[in-house]
Amino acid sequence: SVRHYKRENVSPGLLQELLDSAAYAPTGSNAQNLLVSVVDDIAAMDALREAVYLRLDELAETGAMPDCQRRAFFLSAGKLWKAGGWDGIFRSAPHCVIVANAKNATCVEQDPLIYLSYFELMAQARGIGTLWCGLLYWCLRDVLPDFLPRLGIPDTHQLGYAMLFGYPSINYRRTVETR
């Protein structure tokens, strides 16, 4: 998992290559009902990041934060962003990919995870770092579901998962040995 990114857009050609490769991921009943939403530009990602933290701060300030998984984190995330720019959800990633599946799909939960697994393998093979972002997933699912249409995800689809990605700002010289 990469949690430190260069502030640099992934080239459109490489991004399209990754998305095209992941499109070959199998789906239950070969339905291919996935909807893939990509934030492919740093400026768009910055706008999303700002909007999410602003809304989280409003919910915390007004006492309207829903009771959900990671509620304590979400109560403080907007305040920490406002106070010093701490980006606990997005990790300053320049991009994200969010996958949803048709609510009536045979494998509504599994298909997006398989898609993102393909995306991750191809991305890492091409030098792009990724992070399975549970915090963004929980935030969109439990706290800010009204953001889903902004991301192009209609009511006919169920949020599957989110992945951050971009060029890593840290180089790891060697990996941990495995048995």
Where are these regions (language model features)?
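Acidic, surface-exposed loops and disordered segments
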Residues: 1-179
